[in-house]
């Protein structure tokens, strides 16, 4: 009798779990919960390296496999920028990319993070195309899930760049939401990317939509796989617009998790 009851209970539990998943209509496709100590998993991330300014006159040297700049500890990824007089421009940091290891066309992308603070910091959670099918930036598109510049504390930006809409022309499409405790608490930053539009969220609050006009790739190049990027820049055209405070370093961006779903969980 006990065995029958347990079997029945198991069936009911399985049915309830299946119903919940079906009701939510969302499937987890990929994630990093950062439960591997040390250097971030090379099965999910690669490092981009260099100090050439990255098209924005940034100051940092991005390093690879250096615990000072990127490490996983106690379930959290830390991306940390340091003042370093041995570097030509005076700073080191890290830039992690999932290129070649994880890319998706459409889905719900959510990152739970705590941001650095101070003049000169420029953290970003963003996406670029796996292949530049329509040409180099900005022709093939860019999705900025989260950007924050330290001289404007608490104002978090979600932005889309294309050939027709980009900051070089002053036509980029985006919006901002104030997050007063951005540096002291974790928040979720997300984009729900569908065939017809993108919707941007912070802590589940919707604050920006970008719609597919149906014209051509110059306005919507987002019909191809994109990969994820996590980085902390120093200075640059935007991040360093008000200068760089030399007294604040090191500064860090902490990431609790990165999750990719086929659709937004309800």
Stretch-by-stretch model annotation:
Residues 1-23:
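Bacterial Sec-dependent N-terminal signal peptides
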């Amino acid at each position: 009798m006990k065995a029958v009851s347990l079997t029945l209970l198991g069936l009911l539990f399985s049915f309830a779990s299946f119903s919940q998943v079906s009701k939510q209509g969302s499937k987890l496709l990929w994630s990093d919960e950062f439960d591997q100590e040390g250097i971030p998993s090379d099965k999910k991330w690669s490092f981009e390296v260099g100090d050439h300014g990255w098209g924005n006159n940034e100051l940092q040297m991005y390093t690879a496999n250096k615990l000072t700049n990127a490490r996983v500890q106690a379930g959290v990824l830390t991306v940390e920028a340091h003042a370093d007089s041995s570097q030509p421009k005076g700073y080191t940091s890290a830039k992690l990319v999932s290129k070649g290891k994880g890319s998706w066309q459409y889905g719900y992308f959510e990152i739970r993070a705590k941001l650095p603070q101070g003049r000169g910091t420029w953290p970003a959670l963003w996406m670029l195309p796996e292949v530049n099918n329509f040409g180099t930036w900005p022709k093939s598109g860019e999705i900025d899930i989260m950007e924050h510049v330290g001289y404007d504390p608490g104002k978090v930006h979600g932005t889309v760049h294309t050939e027709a809409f980009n900051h070089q022309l002053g036509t980029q499409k985006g919006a901002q939401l104030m997050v007063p405790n951005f540096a002291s608490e974790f928040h979720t930053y997300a984009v729900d990317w569908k065939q017809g539009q993108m919707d941007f969220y912070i802590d589940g609050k919707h604050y920006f939509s970008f719609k597919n006009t149906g014209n051509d790739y110059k306005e919507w190049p987002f019909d191809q796989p994109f990969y994820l990027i996590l980085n902390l820049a120093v200075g640059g055209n935007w991040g360093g617009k008000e200068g760089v405070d030399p007294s604040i370093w090191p500064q860090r961006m902490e990431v609790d998790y990165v999750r990719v779903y086929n659709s937004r969980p309800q």
